[in-house]
Amino acid sequence: MLHKLSLIIVMTCMTAYARAVDIKARLGLKTPGNPSVSYSLTSDGSKLLAGEALPVEIMQKQVQQGNETVFSVTIKARERVYFNLNFTASTGFATDHCDFYLPGFWYHKNLRSPIEAPSFKSSKSWNFREDRLSAPLSGVYDDATHQTFTVMRRLDPPQEALTPTMDGEVILSGSTSLGYLGFDNETGIAALTFGYPYQESPRRYIRKLTLAPEVVTFAKLDAGESKTVTWTIAAGKADSYGDFVRRAWIKTFDEMGVKPIVSPYTADEVKAQLCSYFRNSFVTGYPIKFNSGENISVETCKSYPTFAVGFVGRSLLNAFNQLEYGSLHQQPDLVRQGNEVIGSFEAHGFSAKGYMHDFINFEKGMPGNEEVHTIRQQSEGIYALLHYLMYERKQGRTHKALEKKIHHLLDIFVSLQKPDGSFARKFNEDGTDVDGSGGSTPSATVPLVMGYHYFKDKRYLTAARRTVDYLEQSIIARSDYFSSTLDANCEDKEAAITAATATYYMALVSSGREQRRYIGLCKRAAYFAASWYYLWDVPFAQGQMLGDLGFKSRGWGNVSVENNHIDVFVFELSHIFRWLGEKTHEPRFVQLDKVMTSSLCQLLPTPGHLCGIGKPGYYPEVVQHTTWDYGRNGKGFYNNIFAPGWTIASLWELYSPERTEKFFQSK
């Protein structure tokens, strides 16, 4: 491993908060079959020198651009070398007062995450490959002084190389554009780390809740060849950690010049192809009919006998989607299927207490009184059925029995709400808590607001207001977005999305000062949600399927700290970005909506262009864009099992931009 011997290069960053920045520089050189040798570097004008002659020449350049310093390093080989460059920039901030930010992967200290994932629980210093991050930036916020410090990589044209081994010292098999970013707190003073090519330490995060030995890679330069790597270093101020994330996201978005891709499909073409999923996944022979949506083989897409009202299955929402589409496009088979799902669910999908059955494995039979419910799945089920009931009402049809069940379930919601306005994440059939944490509370806001509009019951609006009071105080004000998803309990993008969605719904049914409050809260949550979505296209090596397909990652979202892959979880968020952008004059949100809309349909499986999926219309879920996998196949591929139920539902909502506003315009 590299020996950590370093001297200091003093570089003056003439920011608005000007001060000298201490940068420690190291060069690692490796010869095949031998341990690497590390050299500390000192600054001599434009050169970086070691205490002895080196087979390389290293030049540095500093260019002031407003309040930032652009720091470039060029390494030129005198003979063939295998090198690794490392830099550490001291912030002067005491670690105890610092929270860190690596977009889409690290928030605060990642203390909501288990010790088996990267967090301060296992180490206070980490380095990560850039493709783990939704933007190639490392930042720190000092809550004692409100000062901030960031290092951002200026990207090279994308290149990637397959690696013969994944840990230890590794000579790369070809060119890569990937460096690394991170932070170091070993001295009690926070420093940001960066370099090229990538290294990951003290551990690599290789799959869910699995840390592995570190890796340091070395890039080859032949005699006369050179490589230039550039970073932007900036200091600033922010009112809070959330404000720091907002400012960093704005700066990154502007600097990267994020633009939509050339979309391969129109919205109508996407929906027409997704209908193949509706037809091929339809399952009968059980008390409830449904579209098989989870635990499905990527290779065969064979249906599996499990039903999920929400979360990964989204069975009720997909039932409404196909019913509505079939009616509009004269496809009676889809209308029949959608009606059969909802009709059978009305008959068999509710428990004795009036809850929806969250999840049913029909091989084991119907759930009993021991069933555990989640506020998220109950909320997603009500959301789907209220859309269905409003649609039917507009067609002149009523469903009194189903309305009564939904009305009763919303009454249960009101009774479950805690004094602080929150809802338990999970609870028993008798209403007692299984997981009393309030991170999923904003899931309940949406059905409460919809129920208020549909049933004209003001109790539901009162309860919804109380959820936002909790949301503001306990989640948005603290920038503590966690535990919205059900397959992890950590910092995750879905928590920020749900917070933005909840406040969006409240804004739609309010006016004046109250509406302005909700718009402000929505915007704060939306910036945080936006930070999870890629603003750049990660590189792939030849032979990695995603790269061979020409896949571009911009607009796709990292899932959570635990699940370091990207996916199409967006649902209404894209429309919320557009709406917020127009309401608050934030053009970046409008642009991000365009990026998402153009990008998230790229992997649509169609006849003759299946994108690695067994059947047309089954949209992929676990898209592995970095050296992390859910258990199989690695970077550039999918996991072997997937849940297309929710991916289809998410894309359907993405390409149905007026659905929510039309619901509230209906009577």
List the predicted regions and their residue ranges.
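Sec-dependent signal peptide recognition
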Residues: 1-8
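Hydrophobic h-region of N-terminal signal peptides that target proteins for export
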Residues: 10-18
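Beta-strand/loop-rich accessory regions of lumenal/periplasmic or secreted enzymes
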Residues: 50, 62-223
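Long, well-ordered core segments of solenoidal/helical folds
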Residues: 267-301, 333-356, 402-424, 458-482, ...
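Carbohydrate-binding/catalytic loop surfaces
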Residues: 283-308, 354-377, 422-443, 480-502, ...
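Well-ordered alpha-helical scaffold segments within catalytic/enzyme domains
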Residues: 316-332, 380-398, 443-457, 498-514, ...
